[in-house]
Structures are given as C-alpha cells and as structure tokens.
C-alpha cells in the first residue's frame, strides 16, 4: 500500500469521526512579487491598516491545539511564507510535533542556506509555483523580471539535495502560451507538475471588466486544461482519459439538478485554514 493510499484511508476515517486532520496556515499576505491575479497579497501599509502578523509563538500555540484535535497534515502558505519572521523556528516546532509539512512558495527566495535547511529538515514536499518560462512573463504578470531565473535556481538547489519538489502553474492571459514549455521544463527538472486554470477573482481586479482581468474566459481555461493534459500525458493515456470523459458526458441523463447534493469538499469536515 503506497503512502497516498494510506493518506486517503486516514482522511476517510477522519471524515467519519469529524477529525480536523488536514490544516493550512496562511502565515502572511506579504509577498516579494505582485502578480496581477493574486487574491491574497497586500502591501505592508495595506496590511497594517487591517491588522498585524501573528507571532511564531501564536502560531505554535494554535498548532498545539490542533495537534490535540488530531491534525496531522499542515500546509504553510502565504503570501510568500519564507518572508515570515522566525519561519525556521515555527517550522522546526511544527515538525517536532509530528506534523507532516508542505510548503507553498514562489521559490525566488530559496538560496543555498534555505536549500541546506530543507535538506537537513525535509518537508513532505515544497510546492513551487512557476508563472511562466521567461523573464518577460514574470515582468508582465508578476512585476518581477528576475523572478523566473531565481525560482528556477531555487528548484535546482532543492532537487540537487533530494528535496521533494512539485511545480504548480497558474494559467492566465499573460502566460497562456507557456503551457507546453512549463511541462517540458518540469520534465527536465524531474518534478511533477500541475497547472490550475481556474483563478479566484483578484481583490484589485474586482471592479474591472472581465476582459481587463488576468483570468481567462471559461472556454479558454478549458482549452488550457486540455492542452496541459495533452502535453503532460502520453498519447495512449490522454486518449483513454478523453474517451472516458466523452462516455461519461454522453451517458449522463439530462435531468434537473436535485435540490440538495452532499458536499464533497472536505472543508469544515476534515480540513481548515487559519490566516
């Protein structure tokens, strides 16, 4: 039985007992990049108007309560979590509690010191989002021209130390032509990749017309998803997947939606987020 199967069994058991096994700490809204589609990021002045960061001690206190309640899997995210003061102190304390840690980061801050730290105290996985495969895309979308080379360097430093890395992508107007090159890059780095095509409305774009937002039109998002599947799967697997979807759609009766459907999402059942 592989680790993923064990995890699914644990989550299934947690759902039956209403155990909060899976948590997420959104440590801060601050980030060294400024992506157009981001719905989390605040500048320091914007954050100060709304509140302040929790201290490492406050997060640790919360984590102890979570540990007693059965939390095992914990995601550390942001903003950019590596900007959080005392990140290493918090990380090591969470690790000592037996929590299985995953980190979401843009990867641009990872240097030899960070890479050595994660090699010595490895997380379950570090998810690094690549927003494109060129400095031009990072300049236009993230307003950080050096971001691509820095993120790429961070991934390589981690992989050289055998730290588990997964590459995530966020498909928007500015990088919609980068799907194939992102998949090829992930292969060259020996890292799995997933590209999300649905973006939440960005706080700064909510008053703009849809055509002026970073998000793709639904039809374009669907095309991007198909393009990603086609680029990342071998032809036989892709055709099997496509046929399965076609069969499922063609055999689904055209009936009205029921008044109530059981919620499949685990939010509030086995998972939660604290910011």
Which functions belong to the PLM regions below?
Residues 48-51, 127, 140, 168:
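Generic anion/oxyanion-binding catalytic loop in active/binding sites
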Residues 1-116, 120-125, 224:
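Conserved alpha-helical substructure of the radical SAM core
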Residues 75, 102, 127, 166-168, ...:
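A structural signal for isolated positions on well-ordered beta-strands in alpha/beta enzyme cores
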